[in-house]
Amino acid sequence: MTTIDMNQDLGKHIHLIGIGGISMSAIAEILLNQGYRVSGSDMNDSNIINKLRAHGAEIFIGHNEDNVKDPDLVVYTAAIKEHNPERMAAKERNIPQIDRAEMLGIIMKNYKKAIAVSGSHGKTTTTSLISLIMEYSNLDPTIMVGGELDEIGGNIKIGNSEHFITEACEYVESFLKFYPFIGIILNIDEDHLDYFKDLNHIKEAFRKFINLIPQEGFLIANGDDANVQEILHSIECNLITYGLDSSNTFVARNISFTNDGYPIFTVDFKGESMGTFELNIPGKHNIYNALASIATAYLLGVEPSEIQNHIKKFRGIHRRFDILGEVKGCKIVDDYAHHPVEISATLEAAKNYPHNKIWCVFQPHTFSRTKALLEDFSRSFTNADHIIITDIYAAREQDTGEVHSEILANMIQKNNMHSQVRYMKDFEDIAAYIYDHMEPGDLVLTMGAGNVYQIGQKILQRHNE
């Protein structure tokens, strides 16, 4: 077991505000495993919180200054601001406070082979894919993934080796507090424009991320992505690229798709064939995610034949083209896509999947993203036949009245005259409308990073009533 060498001045009791989050809960699990006393708070109870309680964590529902009893350190997420009562209580008592990313960096620093998967899209899928290849190859990594991965029983698996793998999110430049030996950049797009000024600001952050990799370490980068290409100059660490262009280190060729839309392709490494690879996740975008995973595994010493065997065992994670069930001869699928590029890629994957008509229910995520990328969103639904736009999921934001889902729905209709587009607010009404109008062979796809998945569940429940 890798022992985490925390600064001993910080003591043994750590309090996590927002402990139920996907990343914070994984940090809590690691700290509990290391023998730390862990307490925390969250606004809602959940299965994740029940699991942490079962492992010894003391967790409060709701944020209150009384929750901060006697911790030696307080850790908070980016969503927890200074005026939070627990942060204010910690400040009054002179208890040290650090954010989630810094805590994760402290943990990561203790692993010789830390892998950080960054990029605007595909982080969770790629992290999961690399993790399972490593796990099946007996590398016994410690895994932190931003989703529910059935093969490890959740979002965290504690290993007993020098390998650690996690997602590295660029939001508020949190990934600049990490210590990667292998850094991966999947792609770079305009996003999180409530923090970043523009695309150049985003690229600058990724450039700083590259500089975190030691000289003997490795950067694995998407060589086909124009924005990534722009920041690959004057790199001190080892550079490995992947893509479809023959100039890359790892190149996918001879691409075809099964009847279910799953890719099959060959891979060349420096011009030499590594063989044929088959995926059990749909979409061209997942060829790129797979290439990043293949490159990482090969770098870690996994034989190509092993990678071939392990990669086709991966059947995806929750909320990534997640087939929820079938009703009236129609597949109900849910996906986390909430950026125009992700929407286009997911609908392209759906197009290659067996279907009659494609129904797409999209829940925009945050007012700032919707406003900044409104035109891009309006052009992302060309492969959908029926499009329903729900209200914007606010997440961490307040509605300023500058943008509304009805505006987006009207713009989508103008750019997709062949499609039927409507704005609908109520989830029950949406589920009822789709259930009444869908026909055998249709594919119903809910998309968004909020709670839009509930619509698919309601459609399935309606059939069982």
UniProtKB/Swiss-Prot annotation:
Pfam families reported in the protein's UniProt record: Mur_ligase (PF01225), Mur_ligase_C (PF02875), Mur_ligase_M (PF08245)
Reactions that this protein is recorded to catalyse: UDP-N-acetyl-alpha-D-muramate + L-alanine + ATP = UDP-N-acetyl-alpha-D-muramoyl-L-alanine + ADP + phosphate + H(+)
Binding positions (ATP): 119-125
Protein role: Cell wall formation.
InterPro entries, per database record: Mur-like_cat_sf, Mur_ligase_C, Mur_ligase_C_dom_sf, Mur_ligase_cen, Mur_ligase_N, MurCDEF_pg_biosynth, UDP-N-AcMur_Ala_ligase_MurC
Name of the featured protein: UDP-N-acetylmuramate--L-alanine ligase
Pathway linked to the protein: Cell wall biogenesis; peptidoglycan biosynthesis
GO CC terms, sorted: cytoplasm
Gene3D superfamilies linked: Mur ligase, C-terminal domain, Mur-like, catalytic domain, NAD(P)-binding Rossmann-like Domain
UniProt key word Cell division: yes
Keywords: ATP-binding, Cell cycle, Cell division, Cell shape, Cell wall biogenesis/degradation, Cytoplasm, Ligase, Nucleotide-binding, Peptidoglycan synthesis
Lineage: Bacteria, Bacillati, Bacillota, Clostridia, Peptostreptococcales
Enzyme class: ligase
Similarity remark: Belongs to the MurCDEF family.
EC number, as in UniProt: 6.3.2.8
